[in-house]
Amino acid sequence: MRQYCLLLIVLALAAALSDNAVASTLAVARSEIGAPSAVYSERLLRSEPQDEDTFEDRAFGLNWLRLRWLRLGAAKAKTTDVISARESKWIEAWANKNLSPNYVYKQLGLAKQGDKAMQSQNYRIFEAYTERLFAKDQALYTKWLDAKMTPEDVYKALKLDKLLGAKAANSPDFRRYEVYMFKWHELN
């Protein structure tokens, strides 16, 4: 059934395009009968000459199809920037688990894509996740600064003092501690 529909569409398109060719050859043939020196390339029904920008085909022009494709493409471009409810649940779950951005980047398959990762549909999810983490961290820094916590207090609050040696430096919270220490020293 699908093949017949496709065949019907192709035949209709060919007929419509050939109808325009037949109309122009008929105009030339009729003009040679009446006055051999005058050759008309447009339809005989027009009373005033038309330029190419306003020329209309007898069956239909393909400009409406191009315009529709452009409109659909623009609508699709607008919707791809919006994160769906399902994707926002993923982002929230990842933020609650405190997953590192590098881990999420790999899980979304962006590491395999190399330079083309920014063109992927998953890249907008990654951007939304990093923005969510950034907002979460900024709220923490503001809370700690308002409470006038020293870097040592934050170190203990993040429980980095319980980790031994190099384990503290490998912890995801250690980066938060470093950023807070920088912000605290800027203000004091």
Swiss-Prot record:
Keywords: Host cell membrane, Host membrane, Membrane, Secreted, Signal, Virulence
A GO-annotated cellular component: extracellular region
Origin superkingdom: Eukaryota
Pfam family, one: RXLR
Signal peptide residues on this chain, from the entry's feature table: 1-16
Chain span(s) of sequence motif RxLR-dEER: 43-58
Localisation per UniProt entry: Secreted; Host cell membrane
InterPro entries associated with the record: RXLR (IPR031825)
Main location: secreted
Signal keyword on record: yes
Residue span of motif Host plasma membrane localization motif: 73-78
Biological function: Effector that triggers cell death in a variety of plant species (including tobacco, tomato and soybean), regardless of the Rps genes present. Avh241 interacts with the plant immune system via at least two different mechanisms, one recognized by plants dependent on subcellular localization and one promoting infection independent on membrane localization. The cell death triggered by Avh241 in N.benthamiana requires the two host mitogen-activated protein kinases, MEK2 and WIPK.
Swiss-Prot/TrEMBL domain comment: The RxLR-dEER motif acts to carry the protein into the host cell cytoplasm through binding to cell surface phosphatidylinositol-3-phosphate. The GAAKAK motif at position 73-78 is required for host plasma membrane localization.
Similarity remark: Belongs to the RxLR effector family.
Record protein name field: RxLR effector protein Avh241
